[in-house]
A protein has these predicted regions:
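Macromolecular interaction modules
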Residues: 2-332
Length: 332
């Protein structure tokens, strides 16, 4: 049986999609952090105007009062699973497909980075220890000592790469993106950020198929200007990361994204000064990296540069579109 790949995103990445020679100058990335549509009160998670659409196309202003009205999924027990599936299997192919009159040719890469709660995070870092009571044994009544869940601000990242900044408008200004892709975002996401970043690939990926990423969102120490923070992150901190033996052992890709502006009003994304993304072969490799003595030195360096609002978490990677092979380190 021959599989029909019509309109599938397989056609937009290897081995089916065509690729071009790598680019060595810093690329431009719209590092779009997303939070999913769900019944969380707006007091706990902000919501973009017009998002969280109902089946009738209207914004559900108070989703915690009317979760059943959400177009994506009205059953709260299925809300996360349905959202995770929709983003990858429905929204991703819509973004990648060139409908008549549109072209995504200037999108060099589109990666979806889905946060996974079981992975390490700044809210619950490894090592993970067995819980014990005063008697040194496991709790006899575990129902009374369930740890609270620390929820990161974002549920994932749309990592969209362009050769130059003007290409963003050339792509997103098309009717397909400006109308129908935005409409689809309003079904799936309660908020998306709009920051533009300059990408520095410090450790290139061999195949750009590394399954797991550690995403570090940096908000600078208030004593530093954004310019000074970004300079020190790239010129001082990044060489420290690269120089650790644990990085050599575990890290398959390392990129730093420096915020240089936004495509539109961006109250949440504008707070982010930079993002570090380190990719790994497995979730256990992330855990082992974070508990290494080498990473302790990295964490101390980060702590001196960053401030309130910084967070990190682990995610699963999906390469939806990729036109660049092989990946190479950025020349500076």
């Amino acid at each position: 049986m021959t599989i029909d790949f019509d309109r599938s995103d397989n056609l937009q990445r290897p081995p089916m999609g065509q690729t071009r020679d790598p680019i060595t100058h810093p690329l431009i990335v719209t590092a779009t952090f997303v939070s999913r549509v769900d019944s969380t009160p707006r007091s706990e998670r902000p919501q973009d105007a017009g998002s969280a659409k109902s089946k009738h196309g209207n914004e559900v202003h108070l989703p915690n009062w009317r979760p059943g009205a959400l177009a994506l999924e009205g059953n709260e027990n299925l809300a996360f699973e349905h959202w995770d599936e929709y983003w990858r299997k429905v929204h991703g192919p819509k973004f990648a497909w060139d409908e008549p009159g549109s072209s995504s040719e200037r999108v060099l890469r589109y990666d979806q980075v889905h946060r996974i709660a079981s992975g390490p995070s700044s809210f619950f870092p490894p090592p993970y220890r067995a819980m014990i009571g005063d008697d040194g044994k496991l709790p006899a009544e575990p129902e009374k000592c369930v740890p609270p869940y620390g929820r990161p601000r974002w549920d994932g990242l749309a990592y969209i790469t362009y050769a130059e900044q003007d290409d963003i408008e050339r792509v997103l200004g098309q009717e397909k993106f400006a109308e129908r892709i935005i409409a689809d975002e309003q079904v799936a996401f309660r908020m998306v950020t709009r920051e533009i970043t300059r990408e520095y690939i410090l450790i290139p990926s061999a195949r750009h198929r590394d399954p797991v990423s550690l995403v570090k969102i940096h908000m600078r120490n208030p004593d530093l200007s954004r310019e000074e923070f970004q300079r020190r992150l790239l010129d001082e901190h990044a060489p420290l990361v690269i120089g650790q033996s644990a990085t050599t052992e575990f890290v398959k890709r390392y990129a730093v994204l420096l915020n240089i502006g936004s495509t539109q009003k961006d109250p949440e994304g504008s707070k982010i000064d930079a993002v570090s993304i380190l990719s790994f072969a497995s979730l256990n490799d992330v855990e082992d990296y974070l508990v290494s003595s080498d990473h302790e030195a990295i964490a101390q360096s980060e702590a001196a540069l960053t401030g309130e609002g910084s967070e990190w978490w682990t995610a699963i990677n999906y390469s939806v579109m990729n036109r660049l092979m092989p990946e190479v380190a950025t020349e500076r």
